[in-house]
Amino acid sequence: GYEAKYGDKMSSVLDITYKKPERLEGSASVSLLGASAYVGIATKKLTWTNGIRYKTNQYLLGTLDTKGEYDPRYIDYQTYLNWTPSKRWEVGVIGNISENRYNFQPEDRYTRFGTLSNVREFKVYFEGQEKDLFRTLFGTAYATYRLNEQNSLTLQASAFHTKEQETYDITGQYWLNSLDSGTQVDGTTNEEETSETIGVGTYMEHARNYLTAEVQSYSITGRHRLKSHSLQWGAEFKRERIKDRMREWEMRDSAGYSMPQTSEGPELFYTLRSRNETDSKRYGFYLQDTYRFRSTAGLFTLTAGIRGSYWDWNKEFIFSPRASLALIPAFNEK
């Protein structure tokens, strides 16, 4: 596992240190798949970074077997503002807005499969469209107070909101054919002709899926240095609200017969209806100590700590002791 300060993460951790520009700077790039730009501003007490990206893989999706009008678009904006009014205080704001839209109007699909002696051809003609939306908003504000060079306290508040919707109504009419391989008069090239129609049919797919989630978090953390020890602690309160609604169904009609067939009449091949809502609170704390010492072998770092968390949704309390030992060999310290 990982250090106690990293929460309940046991398989992966993303620990980011944000860049602080030292002067006015910027960059930009443009390609067939999108564009990006960055601007950094710096004064004696303030730094501000801004970045924006736009991407589209419309040209890549055009090479798929299913032909149609693909219109995928992704855009996001990130900002980081840091203000240091004095040697003791540091205030920062981090924000992120991202939106991913996927619009698709399928037209037809043409696929061949099988072996050299048994070739199949699958054709589908579509009507309808799909519209998907994924939007995320994230913001964090923090204030750090340094009592001295060895002790500091940080208050932090953050909020996260996401909205996802998947909607489509698509009808497809398909033909499955068997192909015969023949030889031209000169005997140099093989040509394929449709010899038999194995199956025809129609299917309809419908979906109205919506998901919204909100997470609010408030925390206080502290850091204290005592000679070779670095003591860190923290407490956190988090509220999570999730709303999920799914409506999906699929109808299949093979050669004029609705599938599946029952004695009570035609039924849908697949259907899904669900509605879920959760409103829960999480409480957590951690305490850990990092001790560094040298020997002839190199620099050792011993980290040990405890973490506790409680989730009122399942009334479960988790207590997690953690420890790790790292070594930088002496020949690597140079």
Please report, for each region that a protein language model flagged, where it lies by residue.
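Transmembrane beta-strands of outer-membrane beta-barrel pores
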Residues: 18, 32-34, 43-45, 54-58, ...
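Transmembrane beta-strands of outer-membrane beta-barrel proteins
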Residues: 26-28, 48-50, 91-93, 153-157, ...
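Outer-membrane beta-barrel channels and translocator barrels
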Residues: 21, 33, 43-46, 84-88, ...
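Residues on the lipid-exposed face of transmembrane beta-strands in outer-membrane beta-barrel proteins
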Residues: 35-41, 79-83, 139-145, 218-224, ...
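Structural signature of Gram-negative outer-membrane beta-barrels, strongest in the C-terminal barrel
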Residues: 213-215, 273-334
